[in-house]
Amino acid sequence: MANYTAADVKKLRELTGSGMLDCKKALEESAGDFDKAVEILRVKGAKDVGKRAERNATEGLVAVSGNTMVEVNSETDFVAKNSDFKEFAAKVADAAAAAKANSQEELAAVDVDGQTADAALQEFSAKIGEKLELRRAVTLEGDKTAVYLHQRSADLPPAVGVLVAFTGEGEAAEAAARQAAMQIAALKASYLTREDVPAEIIEKERSIAEQITREEGKPEQAIPKIVEGRLNGFYKENVLLEQSSVADSKKTVKALLDEAGVTVTSFARFEVGQA
Protein backbone atom coordinates (compact mmCIF):
# COMPACT_ATOMS: atom_id res chain seq x y z
CA MET A 1 0.00 0.00 0.00
CA ALA A 2 1.33 3.43 -0.93
CA ASN A 3 2.49 5.54 2.01
CA TYR A 4 1.53 8.78 0.29
CA THR A 5 -1.66 10.33 -1.06
CA ALA A 6 -2.73 11.89 -4.34
CA ALA A 7 -2.59 15.23 -2.54
CA ASP A 8 1.09 14.60 -1.75
CA VAL A 9 1.79 13.96 -5.43
CA LYS A 10 -0.06 17.12 -6.43
CA LYS A 11 1.78 19.21 -3.84
CA LEU A 12 5.15 17.79 -4.91
CA ARG A 13 4.41 18.50 -8.56
CA GLU A 14 3.44 22.09 -7.79
CA LEU A 15 6.54 22.63 -5.66
CA THR A 16 9.12 21.06 -7.98
CA GLY A 17 7.51 21.23 -11.42
CA SER A 18 8.40 17.56 -11.94
CA GLY A 19 6.22 15.07 -13.78
CA MET A 20 3.63 12.94 -12.00
CA LEU A 21 5.54 9.69 -12.52
CA ASP A 22 8.78 11.19 -11.17
CA CYS A 23 6.92 12.54 -8.13
CA LYS A 24 5.37 9.14 -7.40
CA LYS A 25 8.76 7.41 -7.70
CA ALA A 26 10.37 9.98 -5.39
CA LEU A 27 7.65 9.52 -2.75
CA GLU A 28 8.00 5.74 -2.99
CA GLU A 29 11.78 5.96 -2.68
CA SER A 30 11.49 8.27 0.32
CA ALA A 31 8.84 6.09 1.99
CA GLY A 32 6.46 9.03 1.99
CA ASP A 33 8.94 11.53 3.47
CA PHE A 34 7.96 14.69 1.60
CA ASP A 35 11.19 16.66 2.24
CA LYS A 36 13.29 13.66 1.21
CA ALA A 37 11.22 13.34 -1.97
CA VAL A 38 11.96 16.98 -2.81
CA GLU A 39 15.68 16.31 -2.33
CA ILE A 40 15.52 13.21 -4.56
CA LEU A 41 13.87 15.21 -7.34
CA ARG A 42 16.43 18.03 -7.04
CA VAL A 43 19.29 15.54 -7.39
CA LYS A 44 17.57 13.88 -10.34
CA GLY A 45 17.08 17.28 -11.95
CA ALA A 46 20.76 18.14 -11.61
CA LYS A 47 21.73 14.82 -13.22
CA ASP A 48 19.26 15.34 -16.04
CA VAL A 49 20.75 18.77 -16.78
CA GLY A 50 24.02 17.06 -17.69
CA LYS A 51 22.23 14.73 -20.08
CA ARG A 52 20.26 17.59 -21.59
CA ALA A 53 23.46 19.56 -22.26
CA GLU A 54 24.28 17.06 -25.01
CA ARG A 55 21.02 17.75 -26.83
CA ASN A 56 20.18 20.59 -29.22
CA ALA A 57 17.87 23.49 -28.40
CA THR A 58 16.70 24.90 -31.73
CA GLU A 59 13.13 25.92 -30.90
CA GLY A 60 12.10 28.76 -28.60
CA LEU A 61 11.07 32.36 -28.95
CA VAL A 62 12.13 35.96 -29.38
CA ALA A 63 11.05 38.47 -26.72
CA VAL A 64 11.37 42.26 -26.59
CA SER A 65 11.42 44.67 -23.68
CA GLY A 66 12.01 48.34 -24.42
CA ASN A 67 15.12 48.70 -26.59
CA THR A 68 16.26 45.15 -25.88
CA MET A 69 15.59 41.89 -27.72
CA VAL A 70 16.49 38.38 -26.54
CA GLU A 71 16.29 34.86 -27.92
CA VAL A 72 15.65 31.97 -25.53
CA ASN A 73 15.79 28.45 -26.94
CA SER A 74 14.12 25.16 -26.06
CA GLU A 75 14.33 21.70 -27.59
CA THR A 76 10.70 21.47 -28.69
CA ASP A 77 7.94 23.80 -29.80
CA PHE A 78 5.76 22.11 -27.16
CA VAL A 79 7.83 23.83 -24.47
CA ALA A 80 8.21 27.01 -26.55
CA LYS A 81 4.46 27.60 -26.47
CA ASN A 82 4.14 26.72 -22.78
CA SER A 83 2.93 29.68 -20.71
CA ASP A 84 5.60 29.16 -18.03
CA PHE A 85 8.34 29.25 -20.67
CA LYS A 86 6.93 32.42 -22.20
CA GLU A 87 6.70 34.02 -18.76
CA PHE A 88 10.30 33.05 -18.03
CA ALA A 89 11.48 34.53 -21.35
CA ALA A 90 9.60 37.76 -20.60
CA LYS A 91 11.34 38.01 -17.22
CA VAL A 92 14.70 37.49 -18.91
CA ALA A 93 13.90 40.17 -21.49
CA ASP A 94 12.93 42.66 -18.77
CA ALA A 95 16.12 41.93 -16.83
CA ALA A 96 18.21 42.23 -20.00
CA ALA A 97 16.59 45.59 -20.78
CA ALA A 98 17.34 46.87 -17.27
CA ALA A 99 20.98 45.83 -17.66
CA LYS A 100 21.20 46.90 -21.33
CA ALA A 101 22.56 43.46 -22.20
CA ASN A 102 24.24 43.35 -25.59
CA SER A 103 25.71 39.85 -25.83
CA GLN A 104 25.10 36.27 -24.76
CA GLU A 105 27.60 36.67 -21.93
CA GLU A 106 25.90 39.79 -20.62
CA LEU A 107 22.49 38.12 -20.96
CA ALA A 108 23.58 35.13 -18.88
CA ALA A 109 24.76 37.44 -16.09
CA VAL A 110 21.65 39.62 -15.67
CA ASP A 111 19.65 39.37 -12.45
CA VAL A 112 16.45 37.32 -12.59
CA ASP A 113 14.66 37.00 -9.25
CA GLY A 114 17.86 37.37 -7.25
CA GLN A 115 20.08 35.04 -9.28
CA THR A 116 21.81 35.14 -12.63
CA ALA A 117 19.73 34.43 -15.70
CA ASP A 118 21.93 31.41 -16.37
CA ALA A 119 21.26 29.97 -12.90
CA ALA A 120 17.54 30.65 -13.28
CA LEU A 121 17.63 28.95 -16.67
CA GLN A 122 19.26 25.80 -15.28
CA GLU A 123 16.70 25.67 -12.48
CA PHE A 124 13.84 26.07 -14.94
CA SER A 125 15.41 23.52 -17.28
CA ALA A 126 15.45 20.95 -14.47
CA LYS A 127 11.81 21.74 -13.74
CA ILE A 128 10.50 21.18 -17.27
CA GLY A 129 12.95 18.47 -18.34
CA GLU A 130 14.32 20.08 -21.50
CA LYS A 131 17.58 21.71 -22.45
CA LEU A 132 17.17 25.49 -22.58
CA GLU A 133 19.57 28.14 -23.83
CA LEU A 134 19.98 31.88 -23.46
CA ARG A 135 20.97 32.37 -27.09
CA ARG A 136 21.62 36.10 -27.51
CA ALA A 137 20.65 39.65 -26.65
CA VAL A 138 20.90 43.07 -28.25
CA THR A 139 20.14 46.54 -26.96
CA LEU A 140 19.77 49.41 -29.42
CA GLU A 141 20.63 53.02 -28.61
CA GLY A 142 17.95 55.66 -29.08
CA ASP A 143 14.74 57.00 -27.59
CA LYS A 144 12.41 55.35 -30.10
CA THR A 145 12.16 51.79 -31.32
CA ALA A 146 9.75 49.97 -33.59
CA VAL A 147 9.10 46.29 -32.97
CA TYR A 148 7.82 43.51 -35.18
CA LEU A 149 7.37 39.96 -33.91
CA HIS A 150 6.38 37.23 -36.37
CA GLN A 151 4.68 33.97 -35.42
CA ARG A 152 5.02 31.01 -37.79
CA SER A 153 1.60 29.83 -36.65
CA ALA A 154 -1.07 31.16 -34.32
CA ASP A 155 -0.35 28.64 -31.54
CA LEU A 156 3.41 29.31 -31.43
CA PRO A 157 5.31 32.23 -29.87
CA PRO A 158 7.27 34.70 -32.05
CA ALA A 159 10.09 32.98 -33.95
CA VAL A 160 11.30 36.12 -35.73
CA GLY A 161 11.87 39.44 -34.02
CA VAL A 162 12.99 42.79 -35.39
CA LEU A 163 13.93 45.88 -33.42
CA VAL A 164 14.41 49.19 -35.25
CA ALA A 165 15.84 52.33 -33.62
CA PHE A 166 14.71 55.52 -35.35
CA THR A 167 14.09 59.23 -35.13
CA GLY A 168 10.90 60.89 -36.33
CA GLU A 169 7.70 62.37 -34.95
CA GLY A 170 4.04 61.45 -35.24
CA GLU A 171 1.92 58.45 -36.13
CA ALA A 172 3.13 58.41 -39.74
CA ALA A 173 6.73 58.12 -38.56
CA GLU A 174 5.89 55.29 -36.18
CA ALA A 175 3.96 53.46 -38.90
CA ALA A 176 6.85 53.84 -41.36
CA ALA A 177 9.35 52.55 -38.80
CA ARG A 178 7.15 49.53 -38.09
CA GLN A 179 6.83 48.90 -41.82
CA ALA A 180 10.63 48.94 -42.01
CA ALA A 181 10.72 46.35 -39.22
CA MET A 182 8.31 44.14 -41.18
CA GLN A 183 10.50 44.60 -44.27
CA ILE A 184 13.55 43.41 -42.34
CA ALA A 185 11.66 40.40 -41.03
CA ALA A 186 10.58 39.37 -44.53
CA LEU A 187 13.61 40.22 -46.69
CA LYS A 188 16.38 39.77 -44.10
CA ALA A 189 18.43 42.89 -44.77
CA SER A 190 21.93 42.51 -43.34
CA TYR A 191 23.03 46.16 -43.42
CA LEU A 192 21.45 49.58 -42.99
CA THR A 193 23.54 51.42 -45.63
CA ARG A 194 26.10 50.32 -48.20
CA GLU A 195 28.75 52.03 -46.07
CA ASP A 196 28.02 49.45 -43.36
CA VAL A 197 29.03 46.55 -45.61
CA PRO A 198 32.54 45.35 -44.60
CA ALA A 199 35.24 45.92 -47.21
CA GLU A 200 36.08 42.21 -47.34
CA ILE A 201 32.46 41.36 -48.20
CA ILE A 202 32.43 43.93 -51.00
CA GLU A 203 35.68 42.58 -52.43
CA LYS A 204 34.37 39.03 -52.27
CA GLU A 205 31.16 39.98 -54.09
CA ARG A 206 33.12 42.00 -56.66
CA SER A 207 35.43 39.05 -57.30
CA ILE A 208 32.50 36.65 -57.74
CA ALA A 209 30.72 39.08 -60.06
CA GLU A 210 33.84 39.50 -62.19
CA GLN A 211 34.40 35.75 -62.39
CA ILE A 212 30.81 35.13 -63.49
CA THR A 213 31.00 37.93 -66.05
CA ARG A 214 34.21 36.57 -67.57
CA GLU A 215 32.80 33.04 -67.71
CA GLU A 216 29.84 34.45 -69.64
CA GLY A 217 32.30 35.66 -72.28
CA LYS A 218 31.44 39.35 -72.02
CA PRO A 219 33.69 41.83 -73.87
CA GLU A 220 36.66 42.91 -71.74
CA GLN A 221 35.80 46.60 -72.00
CA ALA A 222 32.27 45.93 -70.72
CA ILE A 223 33.29 43.90 -67.68
CA PRO A 224 33.83 46.78 -65.17
CA LYS A 225 30.37 48.23 -65.84
CA ILE A 226 28.68 44.84 -65.64
CA VAL A 227 30.50 44.04 -62.39
CA GLU A 228 29.36 47.33 -60.85
CA GLY A 229 25.81 46.58 -61.92
CA ARG A 230 25.93 43.21 -60.22
CA LEU A 231 27.45 44.77 -57.11
CA ASN A 232 24.56 47.24 -57.06
CA GLY A 233 22.24 44.24 -57.23
CA PHE A 234 23.93 42.88 -54.11
CA TYR A 235 23.30 46.19 -52.33
CA LYS A 236 19.65 46.25 -53.38
CA GLU A 237 19.18 42.77 -51.95
CA ASN A 238 21.10 43.14 -48.69
CA VAL A 239 21.06 46.84 -47.73
CA LEU A 240 17.81 47.94 -46.08
CA LEU A 241 17.65 51.49 -47.41
CA GLU A 242 18.30 50.31 -50.99
CA GLN A 243 15.74 47.50 -51.02
CA SER A 244 12.48 47.91 -52.91
CA SER A 245 9.74 48.38 -50.33
CA VAL A 246 7.34 45.49 -49.82
CA ALA A 247 4.67 48.14 -49.22
CA ASP A 248 5.32 49.91 -52.55
CA SER A 249 7.63 48.11 -54.95
CA LYS A 250 8.06 51.28 -57.03
CA LYS A 251 9.89 52.96 -54.15
CA THR A 252 12.91 52.11 -52.05
CA VAL A 253 12.68 51.75 -48.29
CA LYS A 254 14.69 54.96 -47.98
CA ALA A 255 12.20 56.89 -50.12
CA LEU A 256 9.25 55.82 -47.98
CA LEU A 257 11.11 56.58 -44.75
CA ASP A 258 12.09 60.01 -46.08
CA GLU A 259 8.46 60.75 -46.93
CA ALA A 260 7.50 60.00 -43.32
CA GLY A 261 10.39 62.01 -41.89
CA VAL A 262 12.03 58.90 -40.42
CA THR A 263 15.72 58.15 -40.03
CA VAL A 264 16.59 54.59 -39.05
CA THR A 265 19.74 54.62 -36.92
CA SER A 266 20.14 50.87 -36.34
CA PHE A 267 18.27 47.58 -36.40
CA ALA A 268 18.55 43.97 -35.29
CA ARG A 269 16.86 40.81 -36.52
CA PHE A 270 16.67 37.53 -34.59
CA GLU A 271 15.28 34.28 -35.95
CA VAL A 272 14.97 31.31 -33.64
CA GLY A 273 17.61 28.70 -34.34
CA GLN A 274 19.39 30.81 -36.97
CA ALA A 275 22.74 32.61 -36.83
Curated annotation (Swiss-Prot):
GO molecular function: translation elongation factor activity
Cellular component, GO annotation: cytoplasm
Compartments it resides in: Cytoplasm
Name of the coding gene: tsf
Keyword annotations of the record: Cytoplasm, Elongation factor, Protein biosynthesis
Protein's name in the database: Elongation factor Ts
Main function: Associates with the EF-Tu.GDP complex and induces the exchange of GDP to GTP. It remains bound to the aminoacyl-tRNA.EF-Tu.GTP complex up to the GTP hydrolysis stage on the ribosome.
Species of provenance: Corynebacterium glutamicum (strain ATCC 13032 / DSM 20300 / JCM 1318 / BCRC 11384 / CCUG 27702 / LMG 3730 / NBRC 12168 / NCIMB 10025 / NRRL B-2784 / 534)
CDD domains: UBA_EF-Ts
